[in-house]
């Protein structure tokens, strides 16, 4: 069986020794960028390799980019090969944040043409609650070859977002918390607020009280109401830096609403240009008076 959105803890546990399965630990903390790797070295799912959001799943920040620019795809493909991934592998990614960081790797692999990738439902916390095995032993990896192509239709630039909103040809959904979206709090970026015309769907809305994804039917109803009358193919997801937005994109895929896109630069790129409009903060309020 091939998994392309979610995989359960039970299914992963049954395939830990499968020769064509590869597991990646994507735990990360924006507040302490070394914390994820430290946690990985202490314990992780057997066979898992650590994929660092900053070092592996992003490229260096530039003056014109957001906080997590997309990685160099050729370099990432080479790393995947070094990590034992080939084009036949079933890949499983996990974190301890409800899929907020693992979703980035899920989306990247799909954009590179590898659809056999799934997020571990419930993440590492659910895995441990079920008493499933963990280890501190680093896996021994035999390098392989991973061929990829880049489907640049899967994300939009800032200029495309401006054009799409002006022409009302896209529906933009922001995965940040409501406080950040409304501009009431901004603990990370230097400017608070939102892109005018965007709607808010905090990623936590996709999970139940146990940290598992809602059912496909529940997600379908909620997203259908949110995006109407736009079709899924006209929906674009954003967040602070193009990472947690992938959670909403994943949720739509689970719901059977495929084809939505990512604004890769997201809010932290948008505010680099002071001429771009923003809403919900003091600067916008002054400009309207």
At which residue positions do the language-model features occur?
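Cytosolic catalytic domains that perform sulfur/thiol-centered chemistry
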Residues: 1-289
């Amino acid at each position: 069986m091939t998994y392309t959105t979610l995989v359960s803890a039970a299914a992963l546990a049954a395939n830990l020794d499968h020769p064509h399965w590869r597991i990646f630990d994507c735990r990360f903390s924006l507040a302490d960028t070394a914390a994820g790797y430290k946690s990985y070295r202490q314990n992780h799912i057997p066979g898992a390799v650590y994929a660092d959001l900053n070092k592996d799943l992003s490229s260096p920040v530039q003056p014109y980019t957001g906080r997590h620019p997309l990685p160099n795809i050729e370099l990432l493909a080479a790393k995947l090969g070094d990590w034992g991934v080939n084009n036949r592998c079933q890949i499983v990614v996990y974190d301890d944040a409800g899929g907020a960081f693992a979703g980035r790797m899920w989306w990247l692999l799909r954009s590179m043409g590898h659809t056999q990738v799934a997020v571990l439902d419930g993440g590492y916390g659910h895995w441990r609650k079920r008493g499933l095995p963990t280890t501190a032993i680093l896996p021994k990896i035999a390098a392989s070859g991973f061929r990829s192509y880049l489907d640049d239709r899967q994300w939009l630039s800032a200029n495309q977002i401006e054009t799409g909103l002006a022409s009302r040809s896209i529906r933009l959904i922001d995965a940040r918390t409501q406080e950040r979206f409304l501009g009431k709090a901004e603990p990370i970026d230097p400017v608070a607020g939102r892109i005018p015309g965007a709607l808010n769907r905090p990623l936590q809305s996709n999970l139940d009280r146990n940290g598992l994804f809602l059912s496909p039917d529940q997600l379908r109803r909620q997203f259908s109401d949110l995006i109407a009358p736009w079709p899924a193919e006209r929906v674009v997801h954003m967040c602070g830096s193009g990472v947690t937005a992938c959670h909403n994109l994943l949720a739509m895929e689970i719901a059977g609403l495929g084809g939505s896109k990512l604004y890769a630069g997201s809010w932290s790129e948008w505010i680099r240009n002071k001429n771009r409009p923003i809403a919900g903060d003091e600067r916008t309020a002054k400009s309207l008076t």
